[in-house]
């Protein structure tokens, strides 16, 4: 199973980048035990020249285009979504693995968020709590939680209850 993250914006050596790279390596190394073939991060260009609704529509069109080539479960990150414990998230991942899904796609929108059409396609709208997170930090949180879920499923000592 392939894990894909589609995210608006590009990491440019920011402080978050080393964290994403570290969790990416851990996911790829330990995920093999579970049948996870890898993690891809697809960065979509942020539309800085546009504002408001035009920016959101343009970025969401890029996301929709990227999703056209995906067939597995779609999980979008949105502050209005469902909050899960790390164990519940690991259970979701286990379910996708057991079901034999070939890929699972996570979407992180830009600063103006996701439109209803993208959220409506989601199998799960996931929230990291009611607070608003910068999309670059949301990427770190998602990578960490993917690694944590894998560590729970492989009984690695990283996660402690």
Where are these regions (language model features)?
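Structured adenosyl-cofactor binding patch, chiefly the S-adenosyl-L-methionine
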Residues: 112, 116-161
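Short, surface-exposed alpha-helical segments at coil->helix boundaries
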Residues: 17, 21-25, 60-61, 116-119
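Conserved strand-to-helix beginnings and helix N-cap segments that scaffold or border functional pockets
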Residues: 17-20, 86-90, 119, 139
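S-adenosyl-L-methionine/SAH cofactor-binding core of RNA-modifying enzymes
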Residues: 36-104
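Hydrophobic/aromatic beta-strand patches that form the interior of the parallel beta-sheet core
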Residues: 6, 42, 75, 124-126
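N-terminal beta1-alpha1 ligand-phosphate binding loop
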Residues: 1-31
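Short glycine-rich anion-binding loops that position phosphate/pyrophosphate groups of nucleotides
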Residues: 11, 79-82, 110-113
